[in-house]
């Protein structure tokens, strides 16, 4: 489903998202996530994996009122870890060549958080299992494989579009999970949201995505598409649009807010998009409510996101955040 604001009353247009949320260098979904470090100690079996993951945030990962915030395991962390492990499992199962591994594409991601945000990040338990493989005519390479990863109480399902037949003319890729995208290349990409256009009547915002990347050759996962928008790009952009919508609902300044918690998120990206100068993203709150929890007021919302010109691309997420003290529910 493609959302747009055509024919709707526009309430406000803000040139740069930084003018609303603050400098991207001080925001997690701006540049802060790129400063996170991961140490993965994973053991692989036939179609599964288990181990421990350490996630280290710098103190300046996200700042509000010049103070650092306490981090929790984010959707970005969950995707990067689960994506890395899912690729490693599929490479082993199908004995993919280096070329086959680099052109395999992450088509779908679904992330569900536990009952509470996970803040103990020194030794997060990981388990992963290849669930199933199916043939698909509506895919790039004819085969879709689903892998489920658990990070403590968080669950992540990744669907990868890939070739099923081993390419014996090519050397089999190393079975390490040291793919450049998951380790370093995601940090080299830059997304900026401009011309942020608000329609309060339907709780929606549309923004132009301006994208820059080095386009350098990459080895391992999705290395065949160095200029394409990747899952982290989509997740961080839609997360920022979610912040715009959530804060506007209660007329909040980001400096006054608590961390935004994505309770669940599902993203479908069926093929690589090599971006034009810009793409228009739209996010809308389909429903929202205020509730009381342990004496505090919380805003809950369900949002849908879309990409102009690509109706097959979509995002659905359930979000919440605690309102500042004094805001009634």
Residue ranges and their predicted role:
Residues 1-20, 123, 127-183, 280-282, ...:
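HotDog/MaoC-like acyl-thioester-processing domains
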Residues 1-66, 159-229:
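Non-catalytic linker/capping segments at the edges of enzyme domains
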Residues 58, 68-71, 86, 169, ...:
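RNA-interacting cores
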Residues 65-77:
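DNA polymerase sliding clamps and clamp-related checkpoint/processivity subunits
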Residues 71-74, 227, 231:
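Alpha-helix N-cap/helix-initiation motif
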Residues 76-89, 231-246:
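Short, structured motif recognition centered on aromatic/hydrophobic residues
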Residues 78-81, 109, 237-241, 265, ...:
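One face of beta-strands
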Residues 86-132, 244-286:
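Hydrophobic beta-strand-centered segment that forms part of the acyl-chain substrate-binding groove
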């Amino acid at each position: 489903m493609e959302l747009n604001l055509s024919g709707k009353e526009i309430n406000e247009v803000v040139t740069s998202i930084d003018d609303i949320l603050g400098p991207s260098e001080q925001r997690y979904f701006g540049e802060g996530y790129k400063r996170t470090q991961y140490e993965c100690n994973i053991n692989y079996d036939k179609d599964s994996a288990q181990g421990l993951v350490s996630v280290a945030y710098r103190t300046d990962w996200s700042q509000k009122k010049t103070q650092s915030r306490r981090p929790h395991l984010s959707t970005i962390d969950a995707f990067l870890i689960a994506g890395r492990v899912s690729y490693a499992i599929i490479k082993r199962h199908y004995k993919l060549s280096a070329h086959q591994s680099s052109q395999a594409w992450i088509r779908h991601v679904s992330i569900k958080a536990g009952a509470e945000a996970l803040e103990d990040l020194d030794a997060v338990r990981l388990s992963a299992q290849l669930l199933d493989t199916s043939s698909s005519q509506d895919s790039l390479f004819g085969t879709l494989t689903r892998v489920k990863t658990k990070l403590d109480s968080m669950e992540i399902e990744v669907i990868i579009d890939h070739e099923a037949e081993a390419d014996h003319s090519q050397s089999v890729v190393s079975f390490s999970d040291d793919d450049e995208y998951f380790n370093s290349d995601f940090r080299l990409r830059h997304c900026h949201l401009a011309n942020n256009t608000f329609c309060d009547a339907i709780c929606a915002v549309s923004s132009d995505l301006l994208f820059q990347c080095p386009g350098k050759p990459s080895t391992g996962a999705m290395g065949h598409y160095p200029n394409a928008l990747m899952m982290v790009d989509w997740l961080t952009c839609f997360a920022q649009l979610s912040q715009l919508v959530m804060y506007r609902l209660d007329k909040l300044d980001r400096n006054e807010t608590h961390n935004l918690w994505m309770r669940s998120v599902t993203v479908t990206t069926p093929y690589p998009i090599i971006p034009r100068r810009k793409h228009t993203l739209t996010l809308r709150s389909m429903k929202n409510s205020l509730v009381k929890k342990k004496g505090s007021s919380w805003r809950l919302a369900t949002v849908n996101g879309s990409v102009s010109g690509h109706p097959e691309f979509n995002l659905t997420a359930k979000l919440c955040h605690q309102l500042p003290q004094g805001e009634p529910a």
